[in-house]
């Protein structure tokens, strides 16, 4: 007998008693993971879902999990929650304020269950614009959220006149080569007060690194090919399309796009989700220069005009 199931369409309720007139305890969303607790009464069964226990009619459950992609209304900026078919959580950007934090608290019924913990397979900061990373502050501060990994694009803002680091000339262009690829490299930079200064983004990463709730913090790049755990052997594939790095005299670098703003946006983490016949492209905050660059990179044509 199966011990797990998923909420059916569109949004059934967990009830206090095995009756359609029973008090509603918690509404489920289509595809929500539930645990069957084993008690039955006619066509009613006991379950646990969204951190609540109670009764639900068996016909309101289904055996197949969905790929769930939530694009959250967070005001300015972007934020998305992905729930994979194997019931793993992936968070991509979080807006500028606490909208994503409040959505997650509602989505997983955390306010009523302050001791509950939610583990994310990944949190991805596509790039270091505040309207994409600002909302992570409350999330990284909360003991209710745990992360297998936090990913970013390798560009970490720092104090001083060179926001993204020194520009290195090569091949008639300029590149940023001072990239932060792993946790030791991040910790080394965060230990320098002159690096952090009053910049919000490195302070956010410092909060995450010192929280003890993130097992890994590292960069992503196109040569990684896939988000760890979702390669071409997985039912859900998550391809990493960008940022695309170049060799700069033996050092890995990201191309400079006119100014710091265009450069950090243009090197957003870009993901392509592939699930059966569904394709979803998550493009961060790409600009025209970056789009032409990526078109040229992947097509082999001269698209930079």
Specify the residue positions occupied by each region the protein language model found.
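Residue-level marker for buried hydrophobic side chains located in beta-strands
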Residues: 70, 90-92, 124, 280-282
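Acidic, metal-coordinating catalytic cores used for nucleic-acid/nucleotide bond scission
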Residues: 126-132
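Zinc-coordinating Cys/His ligand positions in small cysteine/histidine-rich zinc-finger domains
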Residues: 57
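An acidic-aromatic substrate-binding cleft motif
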Residues: 65-88, 96
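N-terminal cofactor/phosphate-binding cores enriched in small/glycine residues
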Residues: 79-82, 104-109
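Flexible, acidic/histidine-containing loops and adjacent segments that form or flank the divalent-metal
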Residues: 30-34, 38-41, 47-50, 62-66, ...
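Divalent metal-coordination and catalytic microenvironments
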Residues: 73, 82, 92-93, 127, ...
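Beta-loop motif signature
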Residues: 1-42, 48
């Amino acid at each position: 007998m199966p011990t797990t199931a998923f909420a059916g369409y569109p949004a059934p309720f967990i009830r206090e008693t095995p009756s359609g007139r029973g008090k509603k305890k918690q509404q489920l969303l289509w595809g929500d993971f539930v645990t069957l607790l084993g008690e039955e009464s006619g066509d009613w069964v006991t379950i646990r879902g969204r951190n609540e226990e109670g009764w639900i009619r068996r016909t309101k459950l289904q055996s197949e999990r969905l790929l769930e992609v939530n694009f959250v209304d967070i005001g300015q900026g972007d934020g998305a929650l992905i729930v994979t078919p194997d019931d793993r959580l992936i968070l991509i950007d979080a807006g500028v304020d606490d909208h994503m934090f409040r959505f997650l608290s509602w989505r997983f019924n955390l306010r009523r269950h302050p001791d509950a913990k939610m583990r994310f397979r990944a949190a991805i900061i596509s790039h270091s614009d505040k309207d994409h990373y600002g909302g992570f502050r409350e999330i990284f501060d909360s003991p209710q959220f745990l992360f297998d990994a936090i990913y970013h694009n390798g560009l970490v803002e720092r104090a001083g006149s060179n926001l993204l680091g020194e520009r290195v000339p090569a091949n008639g262009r300029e590149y940023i080569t001072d990239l932060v690829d792993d946790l030791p490299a991040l910790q080394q930079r965060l230990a320098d007060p002159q690096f952090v200064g009053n910049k919000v983004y490195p302070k956010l990463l410092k909060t995450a690194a010192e929280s003890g709730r993130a097992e890994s913090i590292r960069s992503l790049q196109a040569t990684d090919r896939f988000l760890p755990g979702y390669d071409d052997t997985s039912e859900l594939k998550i391809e990493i399309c960008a940022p695309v790095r170049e060799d700069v005299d033996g050092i890995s670098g990201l191309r400079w796009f006119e100014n710091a703003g265009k450069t950090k946006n243009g090197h957003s983490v870009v993901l392509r989700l592939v699930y059966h016949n569904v394709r979803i492209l998550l493009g961060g905050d790409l600009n025209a220069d970056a789009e032409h660059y990526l078109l040229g990179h992947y097509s082999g044509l001269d698209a930079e005009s």
